Amino acid sequence: MEIAPDVVHWHGAATDSWFAHIAITTNPQDNAAVWLSPVSDAEYLEATTEVECRYAEANKVLTSREQAIVAVASYTGKGDLEHLKATFVRALEAGMTINEVNEVLIHAYAYCGFPRSLRAIQTFMRVVDERKANGINDKVGREASVITDSGNRYERGRDVLAEISGVSADAPKAGYALFAPVIERFLKEHLFADLFERDLLTYRERELATVSILAGVGGVEPMFKSHAAICLHLGIMPEQLSALLNIVETNLGKNYSEPLRIVLNQLIEKK
């Protein structure tokens, strides 16, 4: 494990196990480790209990599959490939097929771009290959069903968005849809038609993935607010979204979760 400069961290034994380590310092004259105070049993218990409580809440209101989707999506949004490796394993062990995990990563490119989506897919490929080399053959699963609707893609996407958001398809356009009409067309045709019509994930699962991806991206509170509202319209409960943010906080940190928790609380108060 390599620790970046100026990162305060602890290491040592847990309450029920011992731990030994060798610290290697480069350039010890100018880069010497600064040893701080020991961590007391009370401090250790407080920190670990907080994490356990967050996951306990998630376990109460989110299935293991939903928790896996949240973790995969948020790490992908952030571009944290190192933590994605273990997260992919947990997703597969939670019963997700290879194609279903891939679908989360494919969905992600609409919200965090092709580079992070593709890097996550490449990382997932290596995880699957390593597991196969170790005699673990993960279930590939079915492909997405063929889309038989030959209707206008813009209108199909418009109708999907109206269904999941509860906002009339005939609502007047505003904001970016007027300023850059082509992006609004791409959103309807590609995101809400081409992607949302793929049936490897439900609408609910896609929206859980979406808000998690946005959490990982950071700094996109207005988009998070819109999609959190869609989640609520689809029947996802406030406590489920709160548990989602607990997972984000545990995995990515409070700087990723807290701005969104403020937005979520404001949204819930208006309901």
Residues covered by each model-derived region:
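Histidine-centered active-site/metal-ligand motif
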Residues: 9-11, 21, 87, 107, ...
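Substrate/cofactor-recognition hotspot
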Residues: 103, 107, 112-115
